[in-house]
């Protein structure tokens, strides 16, 4: 994922937020993978999202750390689902629905942003 797309996702979340804010975009998220029978530690840049009000079962100040690898997987899933999304990514014109889908896939269905023009 390129920097422009990464920061565009963070900007769209911050601009159209309803219950989650972007707390940090420069966070290093630790991830471990099994390679050749050995656990390797990798560090990815990640988004830190925080709820600023109670929403469903999530309490205020709940924080999610979503690494760039998972965001990239969500972006790939979006491009598979909607072939026109690839053009929007290249032009830097992602929509709110695109970002909601990316974050939902990147968080394994846990975080549903519910972005809107109006804050509730």
Enumerate the predicted regions with their spans.
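Short, solvent-exposed loop/hinge segments that bridge or flank secondary-structure elements
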Residues: 17-22
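Acidic, low-complexity, intrinsically disordered interaction modules
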Residues: 23-100, 105
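Short acidic DE-rich linear segments
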Residues: 117-120
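A short beta-strand micro-motif
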Residues: 6-11
């Amino acid at each position: 994922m390129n920097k422009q797309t990464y920061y565009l996702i963070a900007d769209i979340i911050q601009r159209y937020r309803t219950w989650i804010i972007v707390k940090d975009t420069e966070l290093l998220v630790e991830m471990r993978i099994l390679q050749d029978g050995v656990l390797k530690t990798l560090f990815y840049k990640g988004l830190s999202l925080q709820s600023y009000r109670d929403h469903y079962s999530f309490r205020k100040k709940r924080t999610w750390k979503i690494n760039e690898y998972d965001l990239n997987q969500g972006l790939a899933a979006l491009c598979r689902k909607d072939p026109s999304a690839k053009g929007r990514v290249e032009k830097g014109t992602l929509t709110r629905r695109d970002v909601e889908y990316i974050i939902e896939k990147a968080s394994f269905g846990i975080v549903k942003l519910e972005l809107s023009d109006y804050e509730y």
